[in-house]
Amino acid sequence: MKTQNSWLRSAAVVAAGVVMTVLIISPAAYSKGKKKKAVATPTETMTPTPTPTPEVHMWNFDQDKAGEVPAGWKAIEGDWQVIADPSAPSKPNTFGLPAGRLLKSLTSALEYYPMAIETDPTEYSDFTLEAQFKSAGGRFDCSGGLIFRYVDEKNFYLLAAGCPSDYFALSRMTDGQLINLKQSVVPTDKDTWYRLKVVAQGGHFMCYDDDKMIFDFDDSKIAKGRVGVWARDDSQAEFDDVKVTVIGAGESAPTPAPAASASP
């Protein structure tokens, strides 16, 4: 009997030891199914990338004095000046050539190109250049246009329009020689405002009249330069709201639309 009791006591001690070992090593073994609360992971807030502001340069000449060359511009050839014009798209002033100018000589009548250039030394490569233009008259010609990628007075590109021949042309001045690159017939009346625009990107040019693309053309002779305005012979050309928007500073080049039919 003593031996049996002794054996039972020994068994009880061993069992108690096993229970204590389980409690110490694995508390989960006797837990009543308690679950840990999930900790929420903070959601990362994405900061949107700001859209770059387009780089725009604009001149409306309304703060400049009539009869003088406006601030930021230089007359290369011709009597360019601010003109008070009630018909100006942005009143009261335009920039152009007044009536009553005399040509240097009759022999220079077909090769006289008055022009004015903005004085900022910035040279534009990819950009949109646009302006309001009208021709108020002229005995020999009624033309005007936008100069771009101007290197000097003998090397630049030109988008011009005029009457009475109703021409709309892209040209390049190379070493003083004006070379016609592409031309189309576009009705152009005297004393009527038109919006000329050229989009230049690399060697590709898209040319517009009143927001209608007339044609596009590829030429890569001049990579960059300044901008300006131009006239031919004794044309009384006027310009307003000259604007340059740099492509690549928040401005994308437009998708080319089908061009109007062009004459050879």
Can you annotate each of these PLM segments?
Residues P42-E77, E251-A262:
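Extracellular carbohydrate-recognition regions
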Residues P114-P121, K182-T188, G228-V229:
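Beta-strand-rich interaction surfaces with strong enrichment in secreted/lumenal proteins
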Residues T174-R195:
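Short, aromatic/His-centered strand-loop micro-motif at the edge of beta-sheets
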Residues F61, L129-A131, D191-C207:
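Short tryptophan-centered beta-strand motifs in secreted/extracellular beta-sheet-rich domains
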Residues Y208-G228:
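Short, solvent-exposed beta-strand-to-loop segments that form ligand-recognition rims
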Residues S105-T174, R232:
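Secretory/extracellular carbohydrate-interaction modules
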